[in-house]
Design a protein with these regions (language model features):
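Active-site-proximal beta-alpha core segment in soluble small-molecule metabolic enzymes
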Residues: 1-159, 171-173, 181
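Charged (often Lys/Glu-rich) extended helix/loop segments that serve as interaction or gating elements
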Residues: 181, 192-336
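Glycine-rich and small/hydrophobic secondary-structure elements
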Residues: 179-186
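Solvent-exposed alpha-helices and their adjacent loops that cap or buttress functional pockets
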Residues: 27, 47-49, 75-79, 118-120, ...
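Glycine-rich beta-strand-to-loop/alpha-helix junction loops that act as flexible
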Residues: 130-131, 160-169, 197-200
Length: 336
């Protein structure tokens, strides 16, 4: 959300982007732009190079393909992003395979055996991303795996990007250990070190307001909402996970249990496992929490389900400001 960039600029040194579109948006942030993608296209690279500070490649083949473009840009304009490669530490503690970047055979990052005997001249950075919603103890063990598998590369590079997945804003996150890990690594290797807060920058933010439209009788009744799990919060079905609804408990915690049904025609557009102290009513509003990260960015216009307006709340003034409204033109123009 570029509308909150002024707030984010106070805390972040830049953005990590996946491809051209995110890089262009990151440029609007006004600070460092670091770009990584599983693969780049030449016509995209012409636009990425001028606006990027670091550029991480997913393979040696990609690095070698685009190294001449980087060299040419340096000669022509005096600027080229610092090139690095993404490696696979082959150390995984992520429990959900969908989000495990170090699973066996994963396409993300280069294994150490594929670097043996290779000419690594010109590679200035090492990038790894192995965490997902995890604490600093996992990073500590992952760093040890990187040091064990990639010592030659670590000696050579100027910077190391330790990727995302760090839940640094979670209340029980061990920030002191994170600081020790980063300081110890920098003192040992003498490199510039980066981490990507990612989700942590928006953890526990964003509320999705739903309204009960109908209630379908069944052994476990279904409340039909004016939102959709598959269109508005697909991560709840893909991961899957049970989102938090204010005032709702787990099954058996309260006397009235419901499923939450979405507005699409997908039979599985349903969320399970909610109980309430009182029966739900048609017209009643339900508030889903923690709906900003990995939710808004993955929304779809499937089935023409309308998108909710986006508003920003200022607690100092207790005012809401609507920054985006969606309508039929957005649905129509998405495809053709």
């Amino acid at each position: 959300m570029f509308s909150v960039f002024p707030i984010m600029r106070e805390y972040l040194s830049g953005c990590c982007a996946s491809g051209l579109n995110e890089a262009l948006l990151a440029q609007e942030f006004g600070k460092e732009v670091h770009v990584y993608a599983p693969a780049f296209k030449a016509h995209e690279m012409r636009d990425i190079i001028p606006i990027s500070h670091h550029l991480s490649f997913n393979s040696l083949a990609q690095f070698r393909k685009f190294k001449p473009m980087l060299d040419a840009a340096k000669v022509a304009s005096g600027h080229a992003p610092s090139p690095g490669i993404r490696v696979n530490p082959e150390h995984s503690e992520v429990e959900v395979s969908l989000y495990d970047p170090c699973s066996p055979g994963c396409r993300l990052g280069i294994r150490s055996d594929l670097l043996e005997g290779e000419d690594l001249t010109g590679i200035e950075g090492l990038h790894f991303h192995a965490l997902c919603e995890q604490d600093s103890d996992v990073l500590d063990r992952t760093v040890a795996a990187v040091e064990k598998r990639f010592p030659r590369l670590l000696e050579q590079v100027q910077w190391v990007n330790m990727g995302g997945g760090h839940h640094i804003t979670r209340k029980d996150y061990d920030v002191d250990l994170l600081i020790r890990v980063l300081r110890t690594f920098r003192e040992k290797w003498g490199k510039d070190v980066y981490i990507e807060p990612g989700e942590a920058a928006g953890l526990n933010t964003g509320y999705l307001i739903a309204e009960v439209q109908d209630i379908i009788a069944a052994p476990t009744p279904t409340a039909i909402l004016d939102i959709s799990a598959t269109a508005h919060m697909p991560d709840t079905l893909e991961m899957p996970y049970r989102p938090h609804i204010f005032g709702a408990g787990l099954p058996g915690e309260h006397p009235y249990e419901y499923k939450m049904g979405g507005m699409s025609c997908l039979a599985g557009d349903v969320l399970h496992g909610f109980s309430f102290p009182e029966p739900l009513r048609i017209g009643q509003r339900l508030v889903f929490a923690d709906m900003a990260h990995y939710t808004m960015v993955k929304t779809t216009t499937f089935n023409g389900v309308p998108h909710p307006d986006i508003a920003i709340y200022d607690p100092a003034t207790q005012e809401y400001r609507v920054v985006r409204k969606f309508g039929y033109p957005d649905f129509r123009n998405k495809l053709s």
